[in-house]
């Protein structure tokens, strides 16, 4: 069968666009953060933790890794409505936690929060929907689920309460190969994570920073 030049163009272009759209569909994170992350991690069958998982699709940093690279992990979302959507949208092999991560000195089993679309704030000043969420430190959550394997990626988006979450991590027991954190307190966070043997790697967006675990050679783990 003979094709002229225009037949070839007519055939190739629609398929190219179709494949491009299909490929881009998996990248759902803001500012292509998931695409940027993959350049550094680039592996299959990994294990992630996403705190602030939303509905599991919209603005998700881990959707791509699950759908294209067969990752599984822990998805954490304190807002009940979003948590229900999260469980419906993501693979059932994930671990789903409807809790708010807190520091190790927080004693109450619950915390009051305010929810505004994609933003959840602890004791926020806005007048949006109030919710009451269960609390846990991250290390308590990992111990409860008997997570002893090395964690490939921890992505943290908690709207200004990064220090509280970090305070709830037993770094002597749990570590993360890559740590993505959204924060407006970069230098403070960088100093703290550096003390835990995390090296700053790259700024991936206006407020998203990637760190890598770099244990000292003499450190015993």
Positions of PLM-derived features:
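Phosphate/nucleotide-binding beta-alpha loop and adjacent structural elements of enzyme active sites
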Residues: 1-221
């Amino acid at each position: 069968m003979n094709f002229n030049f225009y037949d070839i163009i007519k055939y190739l272009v629609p398929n190219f666009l179709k494949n491009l759209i299909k490929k881009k569909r998996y990248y759902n994170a803001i500012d292509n953060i998931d695409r940027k992350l993959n350049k550094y991690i680039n592996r299959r069958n990994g294990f992630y933790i996403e705190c602030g998982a939303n509905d599991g699709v919209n603005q998700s940093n881990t959707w791509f890794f699950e759908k294209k690279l067969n990752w599984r992990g822990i998805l954490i979302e304190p807002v009940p409505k979003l948590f229900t959507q999260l469980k419906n949208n993501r693979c059932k092999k994930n671990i789903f936690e409807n809790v708010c991560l807190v520091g190790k000195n927080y004693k109450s089993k619950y915390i009051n929060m305010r929810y505004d679309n994609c933003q959840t704030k602890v004791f926020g000043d806005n007048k949006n929907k109030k919710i009451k969420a269960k609390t846990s430190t991250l290390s308590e959550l990992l111990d409860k689920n008997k997570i002893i394997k090395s964690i490939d990626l921890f992505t943290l988006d908690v709207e200004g309460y990064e220090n509280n979450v970090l305070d709830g991590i037993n770094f002597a027991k749990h570590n993360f190969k890559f740590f993505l954190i959204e924060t407006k307190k970069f230098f403070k966070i960088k100093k703290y994570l550096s003390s835990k043997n995390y090296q700053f790697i790259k700024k991936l967006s206006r407020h998203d920073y990637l760190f890598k675990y770099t244990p000292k050679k003499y450190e015993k783990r």
